[in-house]
Amino acid sequence: MDTAMQLKTSIGLITCRMNTQNNQIETILVQKRYSLAFSEFIHCHYSINANQGHLIKMFNNMTINERLLVKTLDFDRMWYHIWIETPVYELYHKKYQKFRKNWLLPDNGKKLISLINQAKGSGTLLWEIPKGKPKEDESDLTCAIREFEEETGITREYYQILPEFKKSMSYFDGKTEYKHIYFLAMLCKSLEEPNMNLSLQYENRIAEISKISWQNMEAVRFISKRQSFNLEPMIGPAFNFIKNYLRYKH
């Protein structure tokens, strides 16, 4: 039996500003358009031979609308809920054939629907620090800068990297270890307008992002209590670092 642990690394940029209207530090967060559980299911990142509890947990972590979508057994609709019109034909056919083999051929989806019906509650769409997977031979910092621009539209000249700050965290889910690495940046004054509406400006920037906004520490705590991923362990130290940075800067 294969018991090897799989490592998935994501690298991000915690970008902060000082809101001059309320004198509070804020950071940019993005909200995913779909849950991690839904993405893992569509991309077949699970074992059909795993115990049913593991699969039910996956469905528990989907939103209600996502579970309803899976119950249609229409893989095209599931796939384009994530990819929209992105041309990924080879990957699509590979994942569709696996979905068909796992769920459609044995009993025309009856087991899948039965498992979904056992799910309770519902997952939420995560608010996250902008991050993503590094490309081959790409440095950690280069990846963080690239992913931040892709998800927010804000280019490199508008912020300053604070190189003394670099934090990482890891967590495990089954046989997968997820490692997140974060750098820290301070926004330049030219983009510090408190009423700058990032949601309207960049919401269509990338297919996987549905919303983007500035959040202070109180909001970060509120968001963290309502979702499975806690943002405080990374953003809290980043805000403290920014406070000290601004104190010594002035």
Swiss-Prot record:
Activity vs pH: Optimum pH is 9.5.
Disulphide bridges: none
Gene Ontology terms describing biological process: AMP biosynthetic process; ATP biosynthetic process; symbiont-mediated suppression of host gene expression
Principal subcellular localisation of the protein: host cell
GO molecular function, one term: bis(5'-nucleosyl)-tetraphosphatase (asymmetrical) activity
EC class of the enzyme, as a word: hydrolase
Cell compartments where the protein resides: Host rough endoplasmic reticulum
Domain Nudix hydrolase: 97-239
Keyword hit for Manganese: yes
EC number(s) from the headed UniProt entry: 3.1.3.-, 3.6.1.52
Active site (record annotation): 147
Catalytic activity: diphospho-myo-inositol polyphosphate + H2O = myo-inositol polyphosphate + phosphate
GO cellular component: host cell rough endoplasmic reticulum
InterPro entries associated with the record: NUDIX_hydrolase-like_dom_sf, NUDIX_hydrolase_CS, NUDIX_hydrolase_dom, Nudix_hydrolase_domain
Record keyword Magnesium present: yes
Obligatory cofactor(s): Mg(2+); Mn(2+)
Ranges spanned by the short sequence motif Nudix box, renumbered to the chain: 132-153
Entry keyword set: Early protein, Eukaryotic host gene expression shutoff by virus, Host endoplasmic reticulum, Host gene expression shutoff by virus, Host-virus interaction, Hydrolase, Late protein, Magnesium, Manganese, Metal-binding, Multifunctional enzyme, RNA-binding
Residues annotated as binding Mg(2+): 138, 151, 173
Family annotation (PANTHER family): BIS(5'-NUCLEOSYL)-TETRAPHOSPHATASE [ASYMMETRICAL], DIADENOSINE 5,5-P1,P4-TETRAPHOSPHATE PYROPHOSPHOHYDROLASE MUTT
Family per record: Belongs to the Nudix hydrolase family. DIPP subfamily.
The protein's role, per its UniProt record: Decapping enzyme required for the removal of the 5'-end m7GpppN cap tethered to viral and host mRNAs to allow their decay in cells. May therefore accelerate viral and cellular mRNA turnover to eliminate competing host mRNAs and allow stage-specific synthesis of viral proteins. Acceleration of the turnover of cellular transcripts may even promote the shutoff of host protein synthesis. In addition to the mRNA cap, g5R also efficiently hydrolyzes diphosphoinositol polyphosphates.
Oligomeric form and interacting partners: Interacts with host RPL23A.
Protein name: mRNA-decapping protein g5R
Species: African swine fever virus (strain Badajoz 1971 Vero-adapted)
